């Protein structure tokens, strides 16, 4: 899980989701998981 000021999808399978007011990227590849904070 990376915490970044700007979250971007890295590959085609990355999905941007808003959860509890935080923007997250979820993906099949665990290295692509990100959240904004």
UniProtKB/Swiss-Prot annotation:
Which superkingdom is the protein from? Bacteria
Gene Ontology molecular function, alphabetical: structural constituent of ribosome
Keyword Ribonucleoprotein listed? The answer is yes
Database matches in InterPro entries: Ribosomal_bL36 (IPR000473), Ribosomal_bL36_sp (IPR035977)
**What GO CC annotations are associated with the protein?**
cytoplasm; ribonucleoprotein complex; ribosome
Q: What UniProt keywords apply to this chain's record, in alphabetical order?
A: Ribonucleoprotein, Ribosomal protein
Q: Which cysteines are joined by disulfide bonds?
A: none
| Gene Ontology terms: biological process | translation
- Spell out the Pfam families in the cross-references: Ribosomal_L36 (PF00444)
The family annotation for this protein states: Belongs to the bacterial ribosomal protein bL36 family.
**Do you know which HAMAP family this protein is assigned to?**
Ribosomal_bL36 (MF_00251)
Q: Output this protein's name.
A: Large ribosomal subunit protein bL36
Look up and give the organism this protein is from.
Lachnoclostridium phytofermentans (strain ATCC 700394 / DSM 18823 / ISDg) (Clostridium phytofermentans)
The coding gene here is rpmJ
